[in-house]
């Protein structure tokens, strides 16, 4: 029960989901189709005014500049009307995006905490193993050496001289370092 996320009223609604830039552009184009239409009309009026200016037709050029102003006014009205019409939906979308960001931040934080807990557990396990090894080494140092049979000892030392006294890597490096000085 603790691992399950809290239920959200927006989970069941397919309208509220994360979207890519292209999906967002398409959605906005479908929501407010008059804005791109007004922009296209403005561009077309400017193009026609440019062509009229190149041709030297000042009357047509003035008409096209007026048409550009009307097209820009139409675009501005479409922006304002669309903003008023979709105001509540935009507020809901902003709230949803905030919730998504909070959820991602919480997941990131939880993953970080899990990683810290795992590292802490590994560190504790290592310390316990290290303490057990040290305790075993101290115990081995306190035990008396077993009695050796000379024949076996001579044969064993000839075959396996490293078993008699094993030194660690650090001790060997330290000995080499001291010999050089």
Swiss-Prot record:
Top-level division of the source organism's lineage: Eukaryota
Residues that span the membrane, as ranges: 33-49, 69-86
Keyword Mitochondrion part of the UniProt annotation: yes
KW Isomerase (keyword) present: no
Cellular component terms per the entry's GO annotation: mitochondrial membrane
Keywords linked to the UniProt accession: Coiled coil, Membrane, Mitochondrion, Transmembrane, Transmembrane helix
Compartment(s) where it occurs, according to its Swiss-Prot or TrEMBL record: Mitochondrion membrane
Chain positions covered by the region annotation Disordered: 136-160
Pfam families: HIG_1_N
Major location (coarse): mitochondrion
Membrane topology summary: Multi-pass membrane protein
InterPro entries per record: Hypoxia_induced_domain, RCF1
GO biological process, one term: mitochondrial respirasome assembly
Domain named HIG1: residues: 6-97
Family listed: Belongs to the RCF1 family.
Assembly, per entry: Associates with the respiratory chain complex III/complex IV supercomplex.
Function text: Cytochrome c oxidase subunit which plays a role in assembly of respiratory supercomplexes.
Name of the protein in question: Respiratory supercomplex factor 1, mitochondrial
Species for this entry: Neosartorya fischeri (strain ATCC 1020 / DSM 3700 / CBS 544.65 / FGSC A1164 / JCM 1740 / NRRL 181 / WB 181) (Aspergillus fischerianus)
